[in-house]
């Protein structure tokens, strides 16, 4: 016998690792299986009219249609994901024999489209996938991303029903369901995430990447009908699926536009491969899921494109020799099948009829949205080398225009080539692209136009590669060699320009702090049903994670009652963070649960609240005693000298009015020191943001010293927002580091808890060079590098060091040389204790 083996203790899986695997392994595999099975079902029903390349995209379209149908009915919504899985299983069972055959025929025919799809998936996944955390992109850039996540969750749980109860989450949902907002992509995301029991935000980026991959497969199928070289088709499909303007917009929340682009491309690819005709009425059924899914994803917005492609296909099918009556019958079958699949989308879109009427007869004007200036039409050519689409193009404007001219020239050659070769549907696709865009520009404002540019860019790039491919396929002779070389150079140049532009976006895109939201999600689950809850900060994602508590935040606050003079804001503006001391007591007492971000300067909630949960980022406080216990709440700033004789007389009078047996509660303000970056040694190229903060550019450091009046354990935090790592050194020793922790103004980042002695300590805050990691660049948005005041706060008891004394001690407490967060008068019999 060998030596005995000692069993090693098993290590539990890190929750973030589990979420990452769920989002980036289980979820894509689920989509692969569901879309594959659904595609096989469509192939079976259509009599084999779906090619191998389009199997997954057609299955994706059917999945979108099924999930939209399922979420259109409240009672069926929770089972929409299961319904899509059942549909896929039916396809897998019916077509199981074809799977065995396909398994023995893996060749270059499969390899090239697979590479194109993989590249598209990887490019959209890279900013998150390479971090190893289940995050998402575009954090803090636009609140719409959170709203799309909320919509996806609601559709998967309750369909398009009107939400019950008041909360910021429900107000968002009411605004979306009330106006018929299209939800094909969101319904699919929510339903599929529900199948694996994973919250929508963790799966959001993977769904985006999958939608892009489906677009790449559709593009490959379209290109191979006009381009002879598989390599050119592969490159063209991979590149055209990620035009700069679409990539940038998708990484900042454009789930609707990315999905719609892929579905419109699928419709075009199916029409290019096979027009409805007299040979088989069933064959036209392959188109029905694609059209229905496109309508589900973008509602009436798909009309400018499909309104040109489908009539063109109809006319072309009737011009072909053969039985016209059977061709008409084939179109009739398609119309009926499409209508059946699209009924939920049509019904929900009725609420948008007013917008449709405006779009036909006038201009749908939504202003600039989150743009700082209108984006020109030329961006729809596919090359728009920018690190953030919201800002005007400056550094690479000339280069972008040169490459766009090249793209347009190649696209024009592609249209001429298609006409010459009588590839009528390819030509119709190329001609419909600028016509549809012209309509959008004529009937929409800057924000609406942007959405059209994102979708159009995929089509223009596709036709550019048709043009390049047509030149490379010319007969070999001396006269054509130069054209062939020029065509390949042009294709490579366009590819390089698109990839370079997207690399800039990757470099400057923001990432959500995943671990932070995992903590908030856990609080949301732990206190589900305890509400309404209040989250006194501007954070659109808090609405989602606190939805089960009917949470409110400052994005959609519930009629804030701000204490007079507490917040100095110009009329019409809002606060990004509020201290509870800045709010009226009656307002705070409306909420049984308070969820607040941990901060060294935050005030403790009123005395009838107890701390019931705490993480490194958040605290949950529950109202455990009646609001009537707190008779008076007097907010203070922590200064020992702020309480005047008049103030103390008023406090004693309030105690007398409260009656015999009343008491006084107060919270001593803990010792703390503050370092202001603008007063510290800092690089000259780090410019001031106001009087206290710096906007950091590039690498550099700030240095100074802090004087601590007492020794002990200090919580070190900073008001700011950072992307690339920022490291804190105390007396030459590394104390802590933060990265990818962007925040809105007035919110804090936590560096470390350190045991420090009384006296002077040298402080250095260092910011390194940008690396290859996503979001490490310095874009025009300031949130990637805001260095605010450093706070050194002496550790306090978790429950806020609440002190309660008899009312007779009110004078002593008030006149003591000590700073307080607040003082409260408690009613007789109040049970709050120190």
Please annotate each region the language model reported.
Residues 285-291, 331-341, 462, 468-502, ...:
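Signature aromatic-anchored transmembrane alpha helix within multi-pass, membrane-resident enzymes
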Residues 118-263, 393:
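Active-site lumenal/periplasmic loops and adjacent helix-entry segments of GT-C-fold
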Residues 312-321, 333-340, 380-424, 470:
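Hydrophobic, aromatic-rich transmembrane alpha-helices
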Residues 122-123, 297-302, 345-346, 467-470, ...:
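Transmembrane alpha-helical segments
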Residues 494-497, 507-517, 523-570, 587, ...:
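Short periplasmic/luminal acceptor-recognition loop of GT-C membrane glycosyltransferases, typified by
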Residues 54-67, 87, 92, 116-126, ...:
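Membrane-embedded helix bundles of polyisoprenyl
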Residues 146, 209, 257, 261-263, ...:
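Hydrophobic/aromatic-rich transmembrane helices and adjacent perimembrane loops
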Residues 2-108, 590, 829:
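Membrane-embedded, hydrophobic transmembrane alpha-helices
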């Amino acid at each position: 016998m060998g030596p005995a083996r000692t069993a090693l203790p098993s290590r539990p899986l890190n929750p973030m690792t589990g979420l990452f695997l769920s989002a980036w392994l289980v979820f894509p595999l689920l989509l692969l299986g569901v879309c594959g099975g659904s595609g096989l079902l469509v192939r079976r029903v259509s009599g084999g009219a779906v090619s191998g390349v389009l199997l997954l995209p057609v299955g994706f379209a059917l999945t979108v249609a099924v999930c939209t149908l399922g979420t259109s009915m409240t009672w069926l919504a929770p089972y929409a994901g299961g319904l899509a899985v059942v549909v896929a299983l039916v396809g897998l069972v019916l077509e199981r024999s074809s799977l065995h055959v396909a398994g023995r025929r893996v060749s270059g025919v499969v390899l090239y489209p697979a590479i194109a799809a993989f590249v598209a998936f990887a490019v959209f996944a890279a900013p998150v996938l390479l971090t190893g955390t289940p995050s998402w992109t575009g954090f803090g850039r636009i609140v719409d991303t959170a709203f799309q996540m909320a919509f996806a969750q609601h559709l998967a749980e309750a369909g398009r029903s009107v939400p019950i109860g008041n909360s910021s989450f429900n107000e968002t949902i009411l605004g979306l369901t009330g106006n018929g907002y299209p939800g094909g992509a969101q319904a699919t995301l929510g339903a599929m995430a529900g199948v694996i029991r994973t919250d929508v935000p963790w799966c959001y980026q993977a769904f985006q990447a999958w939608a892009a991959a489906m677009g790449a497969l559709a593009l490959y199928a379209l290109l191979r009908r006009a381009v002879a070289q598989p390599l050119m088709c592969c490159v063209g499909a991979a590149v055209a699926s990620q035009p700069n303007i679409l990539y940038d917009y998708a990484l900042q929340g454009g789930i609707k536009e990315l999905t719609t682009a892929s579905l419109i491309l699928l419709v075009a690819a199916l029409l290019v491969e096979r027009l409805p005709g007299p040979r088989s009425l069933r064959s036209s059924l392959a188109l029905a899921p694609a059209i229905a899914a496109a309508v589900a994803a973008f509602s009436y917005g798909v009309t400018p494109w499909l309104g040109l492609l489908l009539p063109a296909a109809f006319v072309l099918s009737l011009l072909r020799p053969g039985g016209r009556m059977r061709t008409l019958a084939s179109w009739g079958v398609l119309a009926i099948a499409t209508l059946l699949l699209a009924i939920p989308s049509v019904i929900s879109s009725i609420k948008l009829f007013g917008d449709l009427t405006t779009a036909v007869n006038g201009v749908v004007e939504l202003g600039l949205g989150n743009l700082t200036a209108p984006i020109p039409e030329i961006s729809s050519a596919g090359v728009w080398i920018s690190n953030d689409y919201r800002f005007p193009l400056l550094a690479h404007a000339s280069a972008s225009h040169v490459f766009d001219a090249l793209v347009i020239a190649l696209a024009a050659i592609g249209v001429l080539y298609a006409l010459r070769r009588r590839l009528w549907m390819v030509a119709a696709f190329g001609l419909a692209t600028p016509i549809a865009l012209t309509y959008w520009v004529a009937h929409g404002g800057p924000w609406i136009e942007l959405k059209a540019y994102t979708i159009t860019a995929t089509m223009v790039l596709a036709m550019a590669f048709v043009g390049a491919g047509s030149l490379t396929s010319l007969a070999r002779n001396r006269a054509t060699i130069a054209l062939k070389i020029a065509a390949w150079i042009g294709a490579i140049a366009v590819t390089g320009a698109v990839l370079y532009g997207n690399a800039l976006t990757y470099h400057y895109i923001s990432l959500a702090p995943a671990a932070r939201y995992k903590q908030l999600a856990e609080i949301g689950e732990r206190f589900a049903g305890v509400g309404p809850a209040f989250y006194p900060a501007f954070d659109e994602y808090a609405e989602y994670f606190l939805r089960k508590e009917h949470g409110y935040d400052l994005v959609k606050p519930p009629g804030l009652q701000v204490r007079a003079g507490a917040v100095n804001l110009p009329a019409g503006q809002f606060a990004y963070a509020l201290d509870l001391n800045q709010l009226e007591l009656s307002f705070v007492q409306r909420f049984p649960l308070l969820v607040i971000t941990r901060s060294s300067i935050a005030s403790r909630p009123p005395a009838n609240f107890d701390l019931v949960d705490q993480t490194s980022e958040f605290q949950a406080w529950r109202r455990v005693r009646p609001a009537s216990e707190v008779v008076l709440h007097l907010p203070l700033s922590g200064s020992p000298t702020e309480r005047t004789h008049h103030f103390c007389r008023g406090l004693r009078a309030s105690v007398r009015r409260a009656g015999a047996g009343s008491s006084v509660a107060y919270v001593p303000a803990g010792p703390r020191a503050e370092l202001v970056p603008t007063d510290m040694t800092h690089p000259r190229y780090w410019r001031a943001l106001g009087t206290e903060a710096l906007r950091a550019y590039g690498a550099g450091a700030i240095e100074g010293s802090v004087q601590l009046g007492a020794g002990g354990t200090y919580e070190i935090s900073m008001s700011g927002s950072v992307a690339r790592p920022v490291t804190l050194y105390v007396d030459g020793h590394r104390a802590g580091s933060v990265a990818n922790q962007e925040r809105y103004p007035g919110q804090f980042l936590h560096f470390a808890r350190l045991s420090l002695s009384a006296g002077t300590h040298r402080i250095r805050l260092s910011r390194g060079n940008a690396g290859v990691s996503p979001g490490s660049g310095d874009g025009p948005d300031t949130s990637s590098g805001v260095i605010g005041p450093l706070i050194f706060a002496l550790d306090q008891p978790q429950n806020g060091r609440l002190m309660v004394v008899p009312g007779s001690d009110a004078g002593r407490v008030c006149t003591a040389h000590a700073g307080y967060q607040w003082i409260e008068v408690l009613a007789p019999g109040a049970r709050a204790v120190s």
